[in-house]
């Protein structure tokens, strides 16, 4: 399986982005035990452009984790574009865009 220029083998094992789970220590452990590619925790595009420190910390990656992906999520196109520019500075191998997060309002409560 290939994603862009990254060859992950025939049956790759991918670590999904999980809030408060896929921190650097967990990602390195997963790589040690055979993950072909890992994700950081998913990151809110709104939090990134507002420079929320917890969001920025999620962009920290090391060479030992590669290939590594960062997923940003949001609903506003302009915000996602600005967040993607911020993520580019972290130099992930893959930038995963998630526009699928629904907005829950009072009608759904």
Task: Please tell me what each predicted stretch does.
Residues 100-104:
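Short connector loops/turns at beta-strand edges and beta->alpha or beta->beta junctions
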């Amino acid at each position: 399986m290939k994603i862009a220029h990254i060859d992950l083998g025939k049956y790759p094992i991918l670590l999904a982005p999980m809030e408060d789970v896929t921190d650097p220590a967990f990602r390195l452990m997963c790589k040690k035990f055979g993950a072909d590619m890992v994700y950081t925790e998913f990151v809110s595009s709104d939090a990134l452009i507002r420079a929320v420190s917890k969001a920025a910390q999620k962009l920290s990656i090391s060479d030992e984790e590669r290939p590594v992906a960062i997923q940003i999520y949001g609903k506003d196109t302009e915000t996602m574009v600005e967040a993607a520019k911020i993520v580019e500075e972290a130099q992930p191998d893959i930038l995963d865009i998630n526009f699928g997060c629904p907005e829950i309002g009072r009608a759904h409560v």
